[in-house]
Amino acid sequence: MDEINRDIREKLPNVHRIFLDFSKLTDVQEQSIPVILSGKNALIISPTASGKTEAVISPICERMIEEFNGEFNSKKLLLVYIIPTKALVSDIYKRLKDKLSKLNITSASKTGDLNNFKINQPQNVLFTTPESCDSLLSRNPQIFKEIKFIVMDELHFLDNNYRGDQLRILVQRIARNANNPNELNYYAMSATIKKPHEMCKRYFKNYEIIISKGDRKIIFATIDAGKSFKKLEKIKNIFIEKKINRAVFFCNSRKKTTQITKQLKEIFRRDDGIFEHHSSINAEVRKNIEKRMAKTDKELSLCVATSSLEIGIDIGDIQVVVLIEPPLTISSLLQRIGRGNRTTDKTTCFGVFEIPGDKKVFTEMIDDARNGRIENIKYKSDISVAVQQILSLTFEK
């Protein structure tokens, strides 16, 4: 264990064995943990599967334990952890709840799919979406009086749209209801973006920017699928040759997802092991698909998805990512590629094109991704959020 690793672990005497075990700390953990322990706010930018969650939750828990001498009231909400999707809330909550429990820190989830948060006996940590947080804040603002930390995960997924503007106001409303708003700490996590300072200042002030680029190598190849993707048989041949049985296929629309799922079932001559995943599919069905993909057996597991699988739901170690069409942005490309080979230092990706023009787009986007060139998307506020938040405030007790 090197000196930096040892020094950081010594600063986390209560939690490092729970959250970080004995493996080497990742770059984002080495950079973030000292900043969070010092009490500073931070925006943490790092690739998928880099250990961002542990980089944030471990020092926060250490501070909670030290501040209350390990005997803090188990019926006070101290940390609200805001996450873009219900599926990711469920995934992170399941991953962390037992670890938090070992530290005598109570936790709960509140979404449209799962709500075990106790209004009269609030747990210490709440994992939720912006919408569910808004509902809770409107009906029970007193819950947030003891709040110490606000965490915003996958912020790039929310920023610069209706939900991001909703979150901006929610953060201010939470602070307004806190007994000690000036002592609140804010932590946001994001994928690579062009102008991190501009994004961060929309949500909180007095922050540090932590950037961990990661060093995963992108192995990329294009596949000509022909008109209407009639040559997808090539995919099957490559999978057999390379002994690939676990892959995620990304599409830009639900319609395309349904089309490709049907074609893959015809090509592989089977229905089992080939799944369709998007937000319109029943939540329980989605969860079962995610569980099946997370299994480590040798059975064929192919999942065709929209952006519903773009952010960090745990679906195990995917051997290859297949892009059925060029993503709309470089950021989206990086997120999708990041879903593959999460336990290694490389990620393998195929870009499937129907027309020669898409092949050129793929080549240019991959070159931009490898060289850190991210598009700058101009921020534009959504005025309709103001109307929604005014209505929400009228219900606030």
Language-model region placement:
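Conserved pre-motif I regulatory segment
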Residues: D2-I45
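Conserved Walker A/P-loop ATP-binding site and its immediately adjacent core
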Residues: T53-E54, K76-D98, D134-S135, A191-P196, ...
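Conserved SF1/SF2 helicase motif Ia
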Residues: E62-I92, N177-E183
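Conserved strand-helix element at the start of the C-terminal RecA-like helicase core
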Residues: L78-I92, Y187-A188, I238-E266, E276
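Conserved helicase ATPase core of P-loop NTP-dependent helicases/translocases
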Residues: N115-K118, F275, S279-T306
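SF2 helicase catalytic motif II
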Residues: L126, P130-D134, N140-P181
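Conserved interdomain linker/interface between the two RecA-like ATPase lobes of SF2 helicase motors
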Residues: Q172, L184-T257, I355-D358, Y379-S381, ...
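Conserved segment of the helicase C-terminal RecA-like domain
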Residues: D297-E299, T329-Y379
